[in-house]
UniProtKB/Swiss-Prot annotation:
NCBIfam families: sce7726_fam. Mutations in this gene cause a clear-plaque phenotype as a result of efficient killing of infected cells by P4. How this comes about is not understood. It comes from the Viruses. This is Protein cII. InterPro entries: Sce7726-like.
């Protein structure tokens, strides 16, 4: 009997499937990548020779947001693939264009299988400003410096993008893909090392792909190693996950605990 799967369960199985197919060699994987000014979040993104997004429609999802997601993802990534439960396959196939991939997952006896319904194709010619939108402000400055374009450090991000847009599309695209791979290299490698070592992965391992969690897990040991259980009661736990969901995980540091404010 088929088992109903949630998004994270499908995601773990999908990563294993992509790995076995050789699609993750020299690739960086990004969990929950935000695009279009954080208006959308791709369930899984891959940066290798191209930028690809995978949107999962699990047994517990609906298709009511699909059209909006497709519009944004197709304008933001070079290839988009919808990974869906069997009950959605027919409707998804009707809604997507020929360049969008469609993969159906099926669960049976604790195993998950994937079937390619439509391959889709890579379109590696996005708008210059779409590519530039993937960069952090510091990375934009690195791009300008790399090609000898002078600028003031006080310039707003929009002005930096205008300056960078004078570069060729190929130069921008190459820099952006390299920057994304470098930015997420550590978290991706932490996760992929488990697959390289033939270790079994689980939903809990998705935390390895979170920069914020990785950063806080290391810092919190330093900050609170000298605190007793009694003194920890003076701290308030920060909902890091909620902050990351709202603002993205490209922040310099989020503390796990803050001192409680006493008003008297």
């Amino acid at each position: 009997m088929a088992e109903l799967l949630r998004e994270q369960e499908v995601k773990i199985a999908l990563i294993e499937w992509l790995y076995k197919k050789g699609m993750l060699s020299d690739a960086t994987i990004i969990n929950e990548m935000v695009v279009a000014n954080w208006s959308r979040r791709a369930d899984l993104a891959i940066a290798n020779g191209s930028l690809q997004a995978f949107e999962i429609k699990s047994d517990f999802d609906s298709l009511k947001r699909l059209d909006g997601q497709l519009k944004i993802f197709k304008s933001s990534f070079e290839k988009v693939t919808i990974v869906c439960a069997p009950k959605f396959t027919s409707e998804v196939s009707k809604r997507v264009s020929s360049d969008v991939g469609v993969v159906e997952f099926q669960s049976n006896n604790s195993s998950v299988r994937f079937k390619i319904i439509q391959k889709g194709r890579v379109c590696s010619r996005l708008n210059k400003f779409v590519y530039l939108g993937f960069l952090l402000k510091s990375e934009l400055k690195d791009l300008l410096n790399q090609y000898g374009i002078t600028f003031s450090n006080e310039l707003h991000r929009d002005c930096l993008e205008v300056l960078a847009s004078k570069l060729s599309l190929n130069k921008i695209r190459e820099f952006v893909i390299t920057s994304i791979k470098n930015r997420y290299h550590a978290t991706s490698n932490d996760f992929l090392s488990r697959l390289h070592g033939n270790q079994e992965i689980s939903i809990n391992d998705l935390a390895l792909l979170s920069k914020a969690k990785r950063r806080n897990n290391s810092l919190v040991k330093f900050e609170f190693k000298a605190c007793s259980e009694k003194s920890l009661n003076e701290y308030h736990k920060v909902d890091v996950d909620s902050i990351v969901r709202k603002y993205g995980d490209d922040v310099s540091y989020i503390p796990e605990k803050v001192l409680k404010r006493v008003v008297g």
